[in-house]
C-alpha cells in the first residue's frame, strides 16, 4: 500500500468502526468472532473521509515522478521538469558551491536537482494567483536553514560562517557501513514496527543498521520503510540497502520527502510555506501562526519548542534562515514569527 493510502488509513478504519458501532440493530459480537471489514467498505469510507480540499491538496503535493525520469535530470538539461528548471533559474551550481563549501562530496548539485524533481510540487507552478517563484525561494531558504542545523559543522572558529557549513555529515557521526547494532531495536518481528517494516539482514544473518544517513539523517526502520515506499512504491529497497540513502540522490531526497509529507497532526512544511495551511483557532491559541517558526515545530518541536525562551538549536535555525533568506532574496517581514518559544 502506498503512502497516499496510508495517510488516511487509520481515519478510515476508525470511521468505519464508529459507523458500525452506531448501527442500532447490529448485534454485539463475541470475542471469538473478530470483525471483518471489506476492502470495498474501506475504499468507500476513505473516499468519504478524504473528499475535501485540504486532503486533495495533500494528495497532490506528495505526487512523485517515476525514478527513471528522475535519473535523467542533470543541470542545464532542457527537458528537465518544470519545477527543476525553476530551481535552476534561482539557484545555479555556483550558488550551490558557495552556500555549501564544506559539504560531503556526495551532496552534489545534480543530486539536489534530482531530489527536487522527484517531488513535482516542490517549487512547482501555482495557478491560483500565488507567486510560484517567491514560494520556491522561501522553500529553498527554509530547507537550507534546516540542513545547516541538522548536518552542519557548527564550527564557529572557521572563516566560513556557520550558516554556510551545512551538509557536512553524510552518515551519523561514529557510524560506518557494515557496523552492527545500529538503530535496529525495532526490527524484532514480534513488534508491530518489525512486522510493518521488516528489516534487512547482512551476510551473517544480523539485522542491518538504520543509523542516520543523508541530509535528514534518516534513522530507524520505521522511517526507512515509509521513505522507501515513497521512492519505489515498495518498502523493501531501502530496508535491504539503507546505504542508498547516503550514496545516491536519495541523500537529499530524504530531506525533501520530510519537507513535503505532513507529520500528523502537523501540516507539511511545504504547506506552511506556500500558505495552504492556515492556523485554526486552536493553533492560534497555542501560538502556532504562519511563519518559519512553525517549521521548527514540525521538524523538532518536542525538543526545541515550547520553552519560555528560544533554545540554542532554534536560535541557530532562525539565524541560518535569515542568512539564506537574504541570499535568496526572500523578504522576512518584521512580524513573521520565526521562533517557537511559548
Residue ranges and their predicted role:
Residues 10, 209-212, 293:
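A short, structural micro-pattern
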Residues 2-8, 18-200, 266-342:
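Cell-wall glycan-active module
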Residues 6, 203-205, 246:
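Hydrophobic alpha-helical context, especially transmembrane and signal-peptide helices
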Residues 172-225, 229-232, 255:
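Eukaryotic endomembrane system proteins
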Residues 133, 205, 241-242, 286:
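A general structural-boundary detector
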Residues 107-120, 209, 213-284:
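Alpha-helical segment that forms one wall of the substrate-binding/catalytic cleft
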Amino acid at each position: 500500500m502506498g503512502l497516499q493510502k496510508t495517510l488516511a488509513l487509520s481515519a478510515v478504519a476508525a470511521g468505519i468502526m464508529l459507523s458500525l458501532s452506531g448501527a442500532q440493530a447490529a448485534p454485539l459480537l463475541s470475542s471469538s468472532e473478530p470483525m471483518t471489514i471489506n476492502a470495498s467498505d474501506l475504499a468507500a469510507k476513505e473516499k468519504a473521509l478524504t473528499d475535501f480540499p485540504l486532503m486533495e491538496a495533500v494528495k497532490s503535493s506528495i505526487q512523485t515522478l517515476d525514478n527513471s525520469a528522475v535519473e535523467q535530470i542533470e543541470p542545464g538539461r532542457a527537458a528537465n521538469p518544470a519545477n527543476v528548471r525553476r530551481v535552476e533559474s534561482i539557484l545555479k551550481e555556483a550558488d550551490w558551491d558557495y552556500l555549501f563549501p564544506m559539504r560531503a562530496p556526495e551532496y552534489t548539485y545534480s543530486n539536489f536537482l534530482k531530489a527536487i524533481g522527484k517531488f513535482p510540487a516542490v517549487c512547482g507552478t501555482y495557478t491560483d494567483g500565488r507567486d510560484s517563484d517567491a514560494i520556491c525561494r522561501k522553500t529553498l531558504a527554509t530547507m537550507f536553514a534546516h540542513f545547516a542545523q541538522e548536518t552542519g559543522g557548527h564550527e564557529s572558529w572557521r572563516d566560513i560562517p556557520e550558516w554556510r557549513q551545512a551538509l557536512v555529515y553524510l552518515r551519523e557521526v561514529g557510524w560506518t557501513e557494515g557496523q552492527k547494532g545500529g538503530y535496529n531495536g525495532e526490527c524484532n518481528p514480534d513488534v508491530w514496527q518489525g512486522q510493518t517494516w521488516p528489516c534487512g539482514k547482512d551476510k551473517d544473518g544480523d539485522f542491518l543498521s538504520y543509523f542516520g544517513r543523508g541530509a535528514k539523517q534518516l534513522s530507524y526502520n520505521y522511517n526507512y520503510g515509509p521513505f522507501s515506499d515513497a521512492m519505489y512504491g515498495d518498502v523493501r529497497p531501502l530496508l535491504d540497502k539503507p546505504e542508498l540513502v547516503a550514496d545516491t540522490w536519495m541523500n537529499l531526497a530524504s530531506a525533501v520527502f520530510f519537507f513535503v509529507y505532513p507529520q500528523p497532526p502537523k501540516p507539511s512544511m511545504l504547506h506552511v510555506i506556500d500558505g495552504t495551511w492556515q492556523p485554526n483557532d486552536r493553533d492560534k491559541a497555542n501560538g502556532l501562526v504562519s511563519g518559519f517558526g512553525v517549521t521548527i515545530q514540525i521538524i523538532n518541536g518536542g525538543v526545541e519548542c515550547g520553552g519560555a525562551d528560544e533554545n540554542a538549536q532554534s536560535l541557530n535555525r532562525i539565524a541560518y534562515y535569515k542568512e539564506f533568506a537574504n541570499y535568496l532574496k526572500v523578504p522576512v517581514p518584521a512580524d513573521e514569527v520565526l521562533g517557537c518559544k511559548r
